[in-house]
Amino acid sequence: MGPLSILTIIFIAVVIDLLFGELPTNIHPVVFIGRIIEIFKKLKERYSLINTRIAGAFLTIFLIILLSWIFAFIIWIFKFNNLLMIIISSILLSTTFSIKLLINSADNVKIDINHDIDNARKSVSYLVSRDTSQLSYEKIISAVIETLTENITDSVVSPIFYTFILGVLGGIAYRVVNTLDAMIGYKNPKNINIGW
């Protein structure tokens, strides 16, 4: 695909995400990735330190290859018609974005914070991993801004960048690595020995 096709796919994918948001969880590729990572996390307890490190590296490579192969196959099926291929590629790429979800989540906090701070705390808890039960008005606003700033990079700018540079499969590979980072990339006691 040429640069114009890639730009068209990116544009359509963003529009799809803005209009429709996330796919249902039972068919969402990121949820599929997450399930495989969860299975790995349960199995890793059986491995020695070196095997856990090797398995973590293998998991990364395996997921990138698996998802890239699945998406490439789906795109290839529609290669006979360029317009269909662009539409299907756009739908697949839209799964790497979370623009509408981010906007809606921030809007929910904005609405809640003006009416009920406890509801605002609960709404912001869906955006951050920290304890939100005692956050003040200012801390809630700060948490939303921090989350939006980080997630604009993770869920908008980076998928677009990698897709533009490496094509649709580059955007997909980015989302795999980003999901791995979010789920097992933190150097806490549970994840310290996964990969290097």
Give, region by region, the residue ranges found by the protein language model.
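Hydrophobic alpha-helical transmembrane segments
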Residues: 1-173, 177, 185-196
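Glycine-rich phosphate/dinucleotide-binding loop and adjoining beta-alpha-beta core of small-molecule
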Residues: 182
